[in-house]
Amino acid sequence: MFTIDFSDHTNLVKEDWFTQIDKLLTFAKEQENIEEEAELSVTFVDKDEIQEINKMYRDKDKVTDVISFALEEDEPEITGIEMPRVLGDIIICTDVAQEQADSYGHSFERELGFLALHGFLHLLGYDHMNEQDEKQMFGRQDQILNAYGLTRD
């Protein structure tokens, strides 16, 4: 089982897109060969809220498109208790998602999917702090999006 807890602080994301993102991230989970039960949260916020979060937790006083908080980093593993793997939290700024969709010439929904997957891959340990890691992460992102059928068209 894969549980995604959605929260929309903006009231801009249509209910059917919660379902679409759930399907995309479930597909990505399968593509990444994660077989155990897992859960995560996806929260949609505006520019003010993501800037506040970015400043508070990352010491960056600026707006960004997506922030991920991986809950498995440096956490001790609890054995003997049957609990789902808690991957973490993804926070997406809908304002920036719309701006980027307009800039790239694709739909708002496609951009939400892209950002959700980007955040998901961060939760799994992918990063883009150097050129090699960026190439690997963005390549994997494109593979999953294309296999799922969520293209830039």
UniProtKB/Swiss-Prot annotation:
Cofactor note as given: Binds 1 zinc ion.
Database matches in SUPFAM superfamilies: Metalloproteases ('zincins'), catalytic domain
Compartments, record wording: Cytoplasm
The keyword Zinc is annotated on this UniProt entry: yes
Enzyme class: hydrolase
Binding site for Zn(2+): 118, 122, 128
Cofactor: Zn(2+)
GO molecular function: metalloendopeptidase activity; RNA endonuclease activity; zinc ion binding
Record-linked Pfam families: YbeY
Functional summary from the UniProt entry: Single strand-specific metallo-endoribonuclease involved in late-stage 70S ribosome quality control and in maturation of the 3' terminus of the 16S rRNA.
NCBIfam families found in the cross-reference section: rRNA maturation RNase YbeY
Name the record gives this protein: Endoribonuclease YbeY
Gene encoding the protein: ybeY
